[in-house]
A protein has these predicted regions:
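Catalytic core of pol beta-like nucleotidyltransferases
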Residues: 1-43, 52-57, 67-134
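Glycine-rich beta-strand-to-loop/alpha-helix junction loops that act as flexible
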Residues: 47-49
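Short beta-strand->loop micro-motif that forms the acidic, two-metal-ion catalytic signature
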Residues: 62-65
Length: 134
């Protein structure tokens, strides 16, 4: 037996969730553009479920910012997190190029995607098995 939706509640909910997802994606894209303006000499990756494509609507964004040299990692992370807009669920890590060889980092970043490659690391990331050929 089919039960009709109560006054289109289901379709309204689905439209609301779709609008909310689009708004989150726009917040994310704007944040990445801001990161690129602030630290153009970097490579920015997305990893985790959003990079693999198996995310759900409430999944956060996992982002790695790679730099050649990091003077004060904690200070930089705090500065970059302050730029994050409210309502954007995001986990941010900052890594140096040397960190990419660490087995734990390699495992975490496997199947990541490059959002911005200001350091020209694409071939090295591919060689390390961190990005997929797309």
């Amino acid at each position: 037996m089919h039960i009709p939706s109560s006054n289109g509640l289901r379709s309204r909910l689905l439209r609301y969730l779709a609008r909310r997802q689009l708004a989150k994606e726009e917040l994310f894209q704007n944040y990445i553009k801001l990161l690129i303006r602030k630290i153009s000499r970097s490579t920015i990756l997305i990893f985790g479920s959003r990079a693999r494509g198996d995310f759900v609507p409430y999944s956060d964004y996992d982002v790695a910012v790679i730099l050649t040299f990091i003077n004060d990692k904690l200070e930089l992370i705090e500065k970059l997190r302050r730029l994050k807009p409210k309502g954007l669920d995001l986990d941010l890590i900052v890594l140096s190029i040397n960190d990419l060889r660490d087995p734990i980092v390699k495992s975490m970043l496997s199947d990541s995607k490059i959002l911005y490659d200001g350091l020209g690391l694409k071939s090295e990331l591919r060689h390390l098995g961190l990005i997929r050929d797309s």
